[in-house]
Amino acid sequence: MEENNIKILGARVHNLQNVDLEIPCGKLVVITGLSGSGKSSLAFDTIYAEGQRRYMETLSTYARQFVGTMERPDVDKITGLSPVVAIEQKTTNKNPRSTVGTVTEISDFLRLLYARASRAYSPVTGEEMVHYTDEQIVELILKEFDGRKIAVTAPIVKGRKGHYRELFESLIKKGYLYARIDGEIREFTPGMKLDRYKIHTIDLVIDRMAVGDSLRERLLTSLCEAMRQGKGTMAVYDYETGKMRYYSRHLMCPTTGVAFEDPAPHTFSFNSPKGACPHCNGLGEEAVFDREKILPDPALSLRDGGVEPLGKYRNNMLFAILEMLGRRYDFTLDDPVGTISEEGMNAILYGDSEPLTINLAEFCLTGGNNLVSWEGVAEYIGRTEDEDSVRSRKWREQFLVYKKCSVCGGTRLRDEALHFRIGGLNIAEVSAMSIARFSEWIADIEKYFSPKERKIAQEIVKEIRERLRFLVEVGLGYLSLARSSRSLSGGESQRIRLATQIGSKLVHVLYILDEPSIGLHQRDNERLIRSLKELRDAGNSVIVVEHDEDMMRAADYIVDVGPLAGRKGGRIVAAGSFDDILHANSITADYLTGRRRIENPEKLRPGNGKSLIIRGARGNNLKNVDVEFPLGKLICVTGVSGSGKSTLVNETLRPILSKLLYRSYDQPLDYDSVEGTEHIDKLVVVDQAPIGRSPRSNPATYSNVFSDIRKLFESTPDAQIRGFKAGRFSFNVKGGRCEECRGAGVQTIEMNFLPDVYVTCKACGGHRYNRETLEVKYKGKNIDDVLNMTVNMAVEFFANIPSIHQKLKAIQDVGLGYLTLGQPCTTLSGGESQRIKLSSELSKRDTGRTLYILDEPTTGLHFEDIRQLLDVLAKLVDRGNTVIVIEHNLDVIKVADHLIDIGPEGGEEGGRIVATGTPAEVARCPESYTGRFLQKLGL
């Protein structure tokens, strides 16, 4: 190997077993292995962490105290490391102002393009707006009004109320004599004023003349004064026709005189006050009160809490007001809210214009007659808006729903910005296009430009085209620039960052990617691989943590970590070319060579004969589809990226069931009706989100088996004698835990300019509990010994305790027997977190009428992990439950009982049901991309 290769000596991060490894530079390297084997520990927690730490070391100690410090990974030595950039799956950007366009910087170039090469059109007449110099305006006036009597005027008031007495007095003092007021030329008189309650338009008369070439200089002088008074706009009044003709130094409508300021990039920015919609401040959505949330049950009365924010009846002023309101609108506090008239309900919700007279003594309240006004429940809720407390804000938000801004229609921009167009399209319309369609449009954009505009736009257009090409190459052509970053999946966010990095044209950089193929249909895989090779060929090193077979075949070098997971992993099983890996003795090699495989099922489950049917689903890009989900089966929803899978399952089906089963406030996207919900009594959504944000969370606490273990220790003779309760055996509360380290087992020593150092607690020796607690034992083991057991060991140890054994067996059954009960959840991979959640569901009793929804459960999973996952899903379905999986992985798709293939393409070209049925039936559909790949598997 070359000298400048990356050499790692003695890596011991997490479960790595003192690993020595040499990775070639300037190559596409794939790190593979089982979930939990140590791939991410090697790639991210060792190589990337050391690269970041070295970068931080270059900063001054002054700077480091502000940006923080990086802990040195547990490794003896790393050499040959170039600057490192990690592109992970995490969707860290929660900013509502962040979009695909802002993240990729395409929006910046697009704003510049519209500021320099767009044309403005009148919002009134639709004709192209013009831009004149003072001399050009003089020529136009001489030509149009030659020989006619005109008045040169300046618009000083446009459609505003007021008497304007002070304005007229000021103008008289300056020597002005006339003005055109509300369409009529009038002479100023002392004390003159207008009706203050009427809307007025006032144009100041600067000069009057009969137009002729001899008065050119006088006309120019008057025009300049009119422009000064009118702030860049003036008008000519034709005495003969009585009409006004407007002119402006700015962009101007030649017919109506409507004028816009010359555009600048910030004119088209929703992050600038100059461009953002003033109503929603550039967010594109507004919070409105949701009547359904305020009145959740029409059968409840006001007394019983029919108006959710007010709660149940209390003897106070609020309900006294409602009772008096009822006398006015003919309802009582005992009437169901659904029977109250629309007029009465509007008065309750939005207030009453007439005050109410309340005799407080009648309601057993102190005082006499009171005149009170009722502002309505909406105003009552809104009062919490100014309160700082998180609790008040959360309480208020539960009654709100976010909808498109009623002013800008979700474009985020001021109205003026939308009247600048290129090829008939404004910037909001272009941003709403799919990236693939936008690429086609901008490929031929020069035809819309004049020669001057073409020259100005040349470099801007080139930059936009390059960035769009990279996004299409990584399979994101279905997204739009206006798509919010918050709505992107981890895989989409990662590929956007990948496209941005390719566009940056950096060289001699080490890129580390975490499974970039996630969320990508098999059809788009080749383009992704091509993009990674392009990054490599630019002179960079690319390390990819990946399980995809196509990616492995395309790699220059493969590192297989294993052989198993957890304590039985963390070693380099094989390293070399794809051919080298095939000859290795590893689980990966077994699957690549076909020695092991996930077999096609011999027969499919018939289901229970019942179905869940959604009719008229039309959210996002769905084309008014009717979809049937046969119950009692493993259902796979497939289709290319952006085809509408998540829209159907996560944004339509899931909220419908959440609302029906749990009175959730989640709003489903548009649909007509749903049938068959009576066959479902429980909904479980299993994702790969972390199962604990704190290091104190572990598999034992998450699965709730730790509560049973603590109760078992409470029942031991030692604990009974000492009077210890179950809480004594918790490391999260005072009593039994070590107070020196507060049950953490380690103590943190803060170092000013270095990373915090963690040392084993001297008081408890890292055992987390105090001496008295550790003296209590069950079968010779104390509570700390139990937390240090692997799940496999604990299953045998607690074999005679059914409540504990059942939960631990469920964790073992999903292939996580290697985890220790006390392992912090923050150290678990996404695949491990997901399987912990599944095990938690497996250990619960079910009625056989549960619907499980999983979104790409194979993320981060090796072939062997997928086999174990499928075994778990099969158990759930065999109990009579229904499992719906959104998936691209062919091993999962081929074993499903029923497929729903959405497409055929992504974005607007998708949203239709291409095929449904068994995998074999879908394989016979020529329009289905999924079907074509299933055919290759022999289906």
PLM segments and residue spans:
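Conserved phosphate-binding elements of NTP-dependent enzyme cores
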Residues: 1-939
